[in-house]
Regions:
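Juxtamembrane/disordered regions of integral membrane proteins
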Residues: 1-193
Length: 193
C-alpha cells in the first residue's frame, strides 16, 4: 500500500490541463469578442479552471470518486477573482487590475474550494491552500517572465515564439510540482492507492 500520489502522473495531468487551459482561455476570449464582451477577464479563470480541473480530476478520480466536483471546484475557484474584477468594472467601480495578482488570488480561492474534497484523504486544508497558492504564484511568474521577453530577449521569430511558449508551459510544471507536495506527503496510508 502506498499513501502517496505518484509525482509523474500528477505532474503530467497538471501540465496537460495547463496546456488545455491556455487553448480554452483563447477560445473563450474569442467567443467573448464575438458576443461583444471583449476585454472580460473571466475567460482566464474559467479556461484555466476547466483545463487544469479536468485533467487533475482524472488523476484523482479513483481517490475522490467519479463526480465532477473537482472540475467545478477548480473552475469556480479560479474564476471567482476574475469575475470580481469584471463585475467591479461593469458596476462602474473598476479596481486596479494585475493579471498576475489575480492569478495568485485565484490560487487561494481554487485551493480553498478544492481542499474540502481532499479532507477525506487526510490532506490538511491549510497545506492544500498553501500549495495551490504557491503553485499558481509560480505559474504566474512564468507568465510574467514570458511576457517580459519582448522587452529584453534577442530571440525573435519562430525561435522566440517557441521560447515564449516553453516558458509559459513551465508554469504548468511548477503548478503540478507545488500541488504534488501535500498529495505525496499528507494522505492517509492507503487513501491514495
Amino acid at each position: 500500500m502506498t499513501a502517496t500520489v505518484s509525482f509523474g502522473p500528477w505532474l503530467r495531468a497538471t501540465l496537460l490541463g495547463w496546456l488545455l487551459g491556455i487553448v480554452l482561455v483563447v477560445a473563450l476570449a474569442l467567443a467573448g469578442e464575438g458576443l461583444g464582451i471583449g476585454g472580460s477577464q473571466i475567460s482566464v479563470g474559467l479556461g484555466m479552471g476547466l483545463g487544469v480541473g479536468l485533467f487533475q480530476e482524472r488523476a484523482l478520480r479513483f481517490r475522490i470518486g467519479p463526480s465532477r466536483a473537482w472540475l467545478w471546484a477548480s473552475a469556480l475557484g479560479l474564476t471567482l477573482p476574475f469575475l470580481v474584477v469584471d463585475l467591479a468594472r461593469l458596476l462602474g467601480h473598476p479596481i486596479p487590475y494585475s493579471l498576475y495578482a489575480t492569478i495568485i488570488a485565484a490560487g487561494v480561492s481554487a485551493g480553498a474550494a478544492q481542499a474540502r474534497l481532499l479532507r477525506p484523504l487526510g490532506i490538511a486544508a491549510s497545506a492544500w491552500v498553501t500549495a495551490s497558492t504557491v503553485g499558481w504564484t509560480a505559474a504566474s511568474l512564468m507568465g510574467a517572465l514570458a511576457d517580459s521577453f519582448t522587452a529584453w530577449s534577442p530571440v525573435r521569430g519562430v525561435p522566440g515564439a517557441l521560447l515564449y511558449l516553453g516558458v509559459v508551459a513551465a508554469g504548468g510544471l511548477l503548478l503540478g510540482a507545488a500541488t504534488s507536495v501535500p498529495l505525496r506527503t499528507q494522505a492517509y496510508p492507503g487513501s491514495l492507492e
